[in-house]
Amino acid sequence: MKIWSSEHVFGHPWDTVIQAAMRKYPNPMNPSVLGVDVLQRRVDGRGRLHSLRLLSTEWGLPSLVRAILGTSRTLTYIREHSVVDPVEKKMELCSTNITLTNLVSVNERLVYTPHPENPEMTVLTQEAIITVKGISLGSYLESLMANTISSNAKKGWAAIEWIIEHSESAVS
């Protein structure tokens, strides 16, 4: 098992970042996300928005990794559940792969909150737990996947900035 974590600060208020995060896919920074389907969306009694989405992704696994895993499949599906609490100003998003679960599990958690010292900024904390199952080079593959997650996180931050920039230019 490998744990990866990160923190990023956006120079935008929470509301702006959340609106962009909800519209993050598709984006030109991370073309590996091929599609997003909303399976369920509801507002609970406390006014929190719950969303359940299915993401179709193309894991660009190197041929060596595919050989070690014993699969040629690179199209994967991810289940994503998010809760947006506009009163507490908190968005929590949890995702897990639902494809190749016999070989690997990736559980990711993202939390967006206003910066504690500057409400014009937003803090994103991310954590991913990666587990490769029953493979002799499992820890090596977990480290490779953690590096990929780190790279994709940076693309995600850039995508949110891109969406905000393009949303603001569309309004002006």
From Swiss-Prot:
Protein name: PRELI domain containing protein 3A
All residue ranges annotated as the PRELI/MSF1 domain in the record: 1-172
Entry function: In vitro, the TRIAP1:PRELID3A complex mediates the transfer of phosphatidic acid (PA) between liposomes and probably functions as a PA transporter across the mitochondrion intermembrane space. Phosphatidic acid import is required for cardiolipin (CL) synthesis in the mitochondrial inner membrane.
InterPro entries the UniProt entry points to: PRELI/MSF1_dom, Slowmo/Ups
Subunit: Interacts with TRIAP1.
UniProt KW keywords: Lipid transport, Mitochondrion, Transport
A single GO BP: phospholipid transport
Chief localization: mitochondrion
Pfam entry (one): PRELI
Marked site (Important for interaction with TRIAP1) residue numbers: 36, 49
Localization of this protein: Mitochondrion
GO cellular component: mitochondrial intermembrane space; mitochondrion
